[in-house]
C-alpha cells in the first residue's frame, strides 16, 4: 500500500516559493519531456500545455517544434506566470510562439475539440480531484489528438520517500526539499491514474511508470 495522499496547495501563490521552484534543476526531465512531445506532435499546430509553471518545458518544446506550431501555456498562479514571462523574455521567444494564459486547468479556456495536442507536466499532483482536469482534456482535445501527461508517483512508504529525497534532492535547499517531499505525498499512483483516465473518456491513453518517481500517460 502506498503512503496516504496528502494534498498540497493547488496554486503556488507565494512569489518566493515560485522563485525557489524556478531555481530547482529539472533540466534533464524537462528536456526529455519536450523531446517526447516533439516526437508525438505529428504536425500539431495548436498545443495546449496545462499547468505550465515557469514555462521551461513549453520553451524547450518551442525549440524543437516546427515554426508553424504555437504553444498555449496555461497557468493559474500569477506568481508563476511572472516567472514564466521572465523566462520567455530571457529565451527570446515571441509571445506569438508561446502564449502565456491565465487559466484554471479544471475550466480550460478552449472550445470543445479545438486543440490539436495537449501536454502537461507535474500538474496532476496539485489537483484535489484529478478527474476534473482529465475531463477538461478530453473535452478540448480534437479526436485522436496526441496527449502527453507526466507527473510524480506517490511512494510506497516513507522510507522510499526519504530515499528519493536523498537521491534527487540531497544538494537542494531546505525549501526545495520540502517542496519535493510535499509533491511526492500529493502525487497519484499509476493505478489511480489509469482508473481516472478510463473514467474520463480518454481512450487510447497508455500509462506507465517511467522512472523511480515519474509516471507518463501518452496517446500517440
What are these regions (language model features)?
Residues 152-200, 206-208, 214:
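C-terminal alpha-helical "lid/dimerization" subdomain adjacent to the S-adenosyl-L-methionine
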Residues 125-126:
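A short His-aromatic
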Residues 48, 54-107:
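Class I SAM-dependent methyltransferase SAM/SAH-binding core
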Residues 119:
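A conserved beta-strand element that flanks and buttresses the S-adenosyl-L-methionine
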Residues 27-45:
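Conserved alpha-helix/loop element of class I SAM-dependent methyltransferases that forms part
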Residues 145-151:
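Conserved beta-strand signature within the Rossmann-like core of class I S-adenosyl-L-methionine
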Residues 132-143:
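A short glycine-rich, Lys/Arg-flanked "PGG" loop and its adjoining helix->strand segment in the class I
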Residues 1-20, 24:
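N-terminal, positively charged/glycine-rich alpha-helical extensions of SAM-dependent methyltransferases
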Amino acid at each position: 500500500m502506498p503512503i496516504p495522499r496528502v494534498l498540497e496547495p493547488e496554486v503556488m501563490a507565494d512569489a518566493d516559493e515560485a522563485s525557489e521552484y524556478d531555481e530547482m534543476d529539472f533540466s534533464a526531465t524537462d528536456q526529455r519531456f519536450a523531446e517526447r512531445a516533439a516526437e508525438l506532435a505529428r504536425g500539431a499546430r495548436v498545443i495546449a500545455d496545462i499547468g505550465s509553471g515557469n514555462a521551461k518545458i513549453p520553451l524547450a518544446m518551442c525549440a524543437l517544434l516546427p515554426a508553424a506550431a504555437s504553444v498555449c501555456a496555461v497557468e493559474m498562479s500569477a506568481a508563476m506566470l511572472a516567472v514564466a514571462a521572465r523566462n520567455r523574455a530571457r529565451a527570446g521567444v515571441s509571445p506569438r510562439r508561446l502564449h502565456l494564459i491565465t487559466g484554471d486547468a479544471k475550466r480550460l479556456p478552449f472550445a470543445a475539440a479545438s486543440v490539436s495536442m495537449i501536454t502537461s507536466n507535474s500538474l496532476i499532483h496539485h489537483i484535489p480531484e484529478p478527474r476534473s482536469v482529465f475531463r477538461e482534456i478530453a473535452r478540448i482535445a480534437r479526436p485522436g489528438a496526441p496527449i502527453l501527461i507526466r507527473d510524480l508517483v506517490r511512494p510506497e512508504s516513507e522510507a522510499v520517500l526519504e530515499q528519493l529525497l536523498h537521491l534527487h534532492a540531497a544538494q537542494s535547499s531546505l525549501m526545495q526539499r520540502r517542496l519535493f517531499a510535499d509533491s511526492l505525498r500529493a502525487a497519484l499512483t499509476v493505478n489511480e491514474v489509469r482508473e481516472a483516465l478510463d473514467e474520463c473518456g480518454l481512450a487510447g491513453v497508455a500509462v506507465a511508470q517511467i522512472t523511480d518517481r515519474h509516471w507518463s500517460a501518452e496517446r500517440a
